[in-house]
Amino acid sequence: MNNAPHLYFAWQQLVEKSQLMLRLATEEQWDELIASEMAYVNAVQEIAHLTEEVAPSTTMQEQLRPMLRLILDNESKVKQLLQIRMDELAKLVGQSSVQKSVLSAYGDQGGFVLAPQDNLF
């Protein structure tokens, strides 16, 4: 069975999904990025299934190589953007933790505001 056209089309779809994920990450549309991940994983599984059935010819591999490079480049860029986002979230969680500690330490003052006063002697 010649599945070369179907395999090539599957790779094109994977490239499109990869480019979509990169665009979403670049635009910081994190919810949409996560939602698109399953379609990407399914596309990868489809390609794996197709290549298990019949190994692509050397010619087909040469045609697919630029697509694979693009997909890997996009994936690397998405990972970098995700790492930046994770660092931002870690910083926010750290700030929130500090605020919680401050509120815990100073929030139980019985409703009194503690402030320095001038000595009136």
From Swiss-Prot:
- Coiled coil stretches, renumbered: none
Chain positions covered by the region annotation Required for homodimerization: 1-50
Q: Which domain of life is it from?
A: Bacteria
Species of origin reads Escherichia coli O9:H4 (strain HS)
Q: Which UniProt keywords apply?
A: Bacterial flagellum biogenesis, Chaperone, Cytoplasm, Repressor, Transcription, Transcription regulation
Record's Gene Ontology CC terms? Answer: cytosol
Quaternary structure (record): Homodimer. Interacts with FliD and FlhC.
One GO BP annotation here?
Answer: bacterial-type flagellum organization
Q: Where in the cell is it found?
A: Cytoplasm, Cytosol
What protein name does the entry list?
Answer: Flagellar protein FliT
Checking HAMAP family in the record gives: FliT
Q: Which stretches of sequence are listed as region FliD binding?
A: 60-98
Family of the protein in this entry: Belongs to the FliT family.
Q: Which residues cross the membrane?
A: none
What role does this protein play? Dual-function protein that regulates the transcription of class 2 flagellar operons and that also acts as an export chaperone for the filament-capping protein FliD. As a transcriptional regulator, acts as an anti-FlhDC factor; it directly binds FlhC, thus inhibiting the binding of the FlhC/FlhD complex to class 2 promoters, resulting in decreased expression of class 2 flagellar operons. As a chaperone, effects FliD transition to the membrane by preventing its premature polymerization, and by directing it to the export apparatus.
Give the principal location in a single coarse category. cytoplasm
